[in-house]
Structure formats: C-alpha cells, structure tokens
A protein has these predicted regions:
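Solvent-exposed alpha-helices and their adjacent loops that cap or buttress functional pockets
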Residues: 27, 107-111, 167
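Short polybasic/polar patches that bind polyanions
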Residues: 8, 106, 132
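Membrane-proximal helix-turn-helix segments that form the acceptor-binding/catalytic region
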Residues: 99-113
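Structural motif corresponding to the C-terminal cap of alpha-helices
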Residues: 75, 108, 159-161
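Conserved ATP-binding loop and adjacent catalytic segment of the adenylate-forming AMP-binding
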Residues: 15, 89-94, 112-171
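Conserved AMP-binding/adenylation subdomain of ANL enzymes
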Residues: 1-98, 112, 137
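Generic structural marker for isolated residues within well-ordered, non-membrane alpha-helices
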Residues: 3, 101, 128
C-alpha cells in the first residue's frame, strides 16, 4: 500500500495485475518504468532468458554469455566499488547495452525500466548478479507488510553493497 501511495503522490499511473498467469502479457502491454516484484518473478525472468539463450545458435549464444560477463564485470566489479572502468570494458558494455541488453529488455517489456523494488523473500545472488549485469536497477529490501515499513534496502547506487544482504537499515 505504501508504494501505491508514493506513486499516487508523484502522479504515476498504477497498474494492478490480478492474474499472476497473465503477468508477461500485462508487462508487455504496460511497459512499466518501475515495478514492485517478489524474487520469484525475477527467478522466472532469469530462467526464461537463460532458456532462450540456450536455444540460440552457438556463436550467438557465446556472444550473449560474453555480453552478460562484460555487464557483470563493469557493474559489479567496477561501478559497485566506485572504481574506474577499463576503457575496453566500457566500450563493450555500451555496445551490448544498446544492442543485446536492449533487445532482452524489450522482449520482456521492460525497456523503459528505471528501478525495481524487490522484497518478500531473499533474491538469490546469482539472479541479482544477472539482473544487474543487464543493467536492471534493482532495489532489494526488507520490511514488514503489516506495518508497511521498509527497514533496510540496497540500491546499486549504494557503493560496496553485498548482494547476499538486504542492505543497511534505513534512518
């Protein structure tokens, strides 16, 4: 509820999906900028993308996995720790972001993505790494539904965050 109030306060449109089986269709129709989702949703995205990659021809498959590795190296090894990104890594990343990552996001209906709050249970480290490699701005947190209070979260902008945690307590 608190998320809805925040969105309404900022003039955002709110879409409510009543049927979990129709989530892919709903996302492709609405093309959200922001979306709250539980880790299970992102696990299915992770599995679905990997399933499609595995069905690709050999060279394309290798290119996709290389692109993900470059995204991981840039976003998790350098940007997350506020380190300077090597020129070759940055160039490759920018090319992959405009081509392959953009294509994956468009296929998912998430090409307009700004950030995605995620809570409800633990988001696995491998899924979080994958999403951040593709330039999804994940905001992973913990809070009590009963009190609508987020007590901790991390954002990629918070340097040095541990992907196995839900961040630091909010003040």
């Amino acid at each position: 509820r608190a998320w809805d109030y925040l969105c309404m306060n900022r003039g955002a449109m709110i879409y409510v999906n009543k049927d979990p089986k129709e989530i892919q269709t709903a996302i492709k129709e609405t093309r959200p900028n922001m979306m709250c989702a539980v880790p299970r949703f992102w696990e299915k995205v992770y599995a679905g993308v990997h399933e499609k990659i595995e069905k690709m021809p050999g060279l394309v498959k290798k290119l996709m996995y290389h692109a993900i590795a470059v995204g991981k190296k840039r976003n998790l090894d350098y940007v997350r720790f506020n380190k300077s990104v090597p020129f070759s890594t940055e160039i490759q990343y920018k090319i992959f972001k405009k081509t392959l990552f953009a294509k994956v996001k468009k296929e998912l209906g998430l090409e307009n993505s700004m950030y995605f709050p995620c809570a409800g249970s633990q988001l696995s480290e491998s899924v979080c790494e994958f999403l951040m490699s593709l330039d999804f701005n994940m905001v992973v947190g913990y809070g009590l539904t009963e009190s609508t209070a987020t007590v901790s979260c991390f954002q990629p902008a918070h340097k040095h965050h541990d992907l196995k945690s839900v961040g630091e307590g909010m003040q």
